[in-house]
Amino acid sequence: SRMINHVFSPDEMWTEVGISTVDQSAPYYRTDGYWNGAVWFPHQWMVWKALLDLGEGEKAYQVATTALNTWEKECKESYYTFEHFIISSQRGAGWHQFSGLSSPILNWFAAYYRIGKVSTGFEVWISNSHFNDDYTQYQAEIAFDDSTVPHQRTILVCMNPEKDYQVTFNGKVVESKTYHQGLLEITLPSTNKSGKLTVTSVWHYKPYTG
């Protein structure tokens, strides 16, 4: 909790274009820095995965959407794929045709928008993962890293956006939320015991109003 507060403090690590490489209050922070005062995507991807492990789904979404918006804005304005971003100007910098570090952008987009994509942190291991043909049902066997104490973790599942869904783990309904139709941000229970995750479409009765 304390570390998360540091990461998302606008006086320290958090900026309008993402997480700084170093604390902005540090004496070695530079406004024209390369690695000591800029925003890169690879280290943010690792933070994003860790936030999913900690059950901090909203914070993970904040990291991913800020990165996607930053990338989209720069690409629209310059048509370039820069290495990193300067915090003060919020613009891309470094080599302008640098696609070598673009995989975090692709992974974030897929995690929140590509139907049939399942995303977890480092502590959740999925086996026997299966969607039905129209992506309205999903089942998976899930195991956890038992070297840590049991705690809530977040998993993202992109379903068919035309339906609403109920999520169960080992037969019990678990919490889920969405930022847009089809995306499920699922909060797994505080356990290290393996189990079965099921996502099923639900039908809502709509009374006749004519």
Per-region residue spans from a language model:
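C-terminal capping/lid segments that line or modulate ligand- or cofactor-binding pockets
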Residues: 1-11, 27, 33-148
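Active-site-adjacent bridging/hinge elements
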Residues: 16-25
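Solvent-exposed loop and beta-edge segments used for protein-protein assembly and interaction
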Residues: 41, 132-136, 159-161, 180, ...
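Glycan-association/targeting regions that enable binding to alpha-glucans and other polysaccharides
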Residues: 121-125, 147-152, 177-179, 185-189
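Hydrophobic beta-strand residues in large extracellular and virion-surface proteins
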Residues: 124-126, 140-142, 157, 165-167, ...
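Surface-exposed beta-strand/loop patches in extracellular or lumenal glycoproteins
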Residues: 145-163
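Short strand-turn-strand beta-turns centered on an Asx-Gly dipeptide
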Residues: 168-172
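C-terminal beta-strand-rich structural cap/linker in extracellular carbohydrate-active enzymes
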Residues: 178-210
